[in-house]
């Protein structure tokens, strides 16, 4: 493998490989997770092994960061073990959006069981908090983009991995491409490569790559990946 620092000593960016966690049973059942702490299922662990194998064959990873929720942390541990037995550094600011009273519900039933929460969740406004302690999209955006910038500032000239959640990755995309069309599905263990430059410039080099899953038979299911699945 290559060195963890890039060839040029004056590289002015950090390369951050942002990975969504593997599948959970709640993803498969379309249950809303948010901050609820659900473990990977067997399919999710196999997905994590595949993405770990892939990343271990690419440019060397210097650090692995993760949300502290189990589904992300376990995915990160599998990647870290394969990429040089690295320590996983957790950051609560990489957690999924808190979805308030929506959490724990099957998505199709949420509008009937928690209509006020569903209304807030479905709003076109980005400043609406979800009843039950949930976050607005603006709060999620500020939290997770600040976290990634903080991580990037520490690791200029390095390639690192960040394991997080679908809602977070969607916000990171909006930070890098504010005028682009909104993204819909973020697949489990998809690889998304960001470069964070000096001067707060972000670019996306790779988006939504799940080529490591193509031979596993997992790809067709989609693994949730919509904005409710976490």
UniProtKB/Swiss-Prot annotation:
PROSITE patterns membership: PG_MUTASE
Pfam families according to UniProt: His_Phos_1
Active site: 21 (tele-phosphohistidine intermediate), 96 (proton donor/acceptor)
InterPro entries: His_Pase_superF_clade-1, His_PPase_superfam, PG/BPGM_mutase_AS, PGM_Phosphatase
Molecular function as annotated in GO: catalytic activity
Residues the UniProt record annotates as site (Transition state stabilizer): 165
PANTHER family (UniProt xref): BROAD-SPECIFICITY PHOSPHATASE YOR283W-RELATED, PHOSPHOGLYCERATE MUTASE-LIKE PROTEIN 4
Protein family: Belongs to the phosphoglycerate mutase family.
Known function: May play a role in carbohydrates metabolism.
Protein name: Phosphoglycerate mutase-like protein 4
Organism name: Arabidopsis thaliana (Mouse-ear cress)
């Amino acid at each position: 493998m290559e060195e963890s620092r890039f060839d040029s000593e004056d590289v002015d960016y950090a390369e951050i490989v942002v990975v969504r966690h593997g599948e959970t049973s709640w993803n498969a059942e379309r249950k809303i997770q948010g901050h609820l702490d659900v473990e990977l299922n067997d399919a999710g662990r196999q997905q994590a092994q595949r993405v770990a194998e892939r990343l271990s064959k690419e440019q060397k990873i210097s650090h692995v960061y993760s949300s502290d929720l189990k589904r992300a942390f376990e995915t990160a541990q599998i990647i870290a073990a394969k990429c040089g037995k690295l320590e996983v550094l957790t950051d609560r600011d990489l957690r999924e959006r808190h979805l308030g009273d929506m959490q724990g519900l099957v998505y199709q039933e949420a509008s009937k069981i928690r209509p006020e929460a569903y209304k807030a969740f479905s709003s076109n406004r980005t400043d609406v908090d979800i009843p039950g302690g949930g976050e607005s999209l603006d709060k999620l955006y500020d939290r997770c983009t600040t976290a990634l910038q903080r991580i990037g500032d520490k690791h200029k000239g390095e390639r690192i991995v960040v394991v997080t959640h679908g809602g977070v990755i969607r916000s990171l995309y909006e930070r890098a491409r504010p005028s682009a069309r909104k993204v819909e599905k973020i697949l489990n263990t998809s690889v998304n490569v960001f470069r964070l430059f000096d001067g707060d410039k972000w670019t996306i080099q790779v988006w939504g790559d799940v080529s490591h899953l193509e031979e596993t038979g997992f790809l067709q299911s989609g693994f949730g990946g919509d904005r409710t699945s976490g």
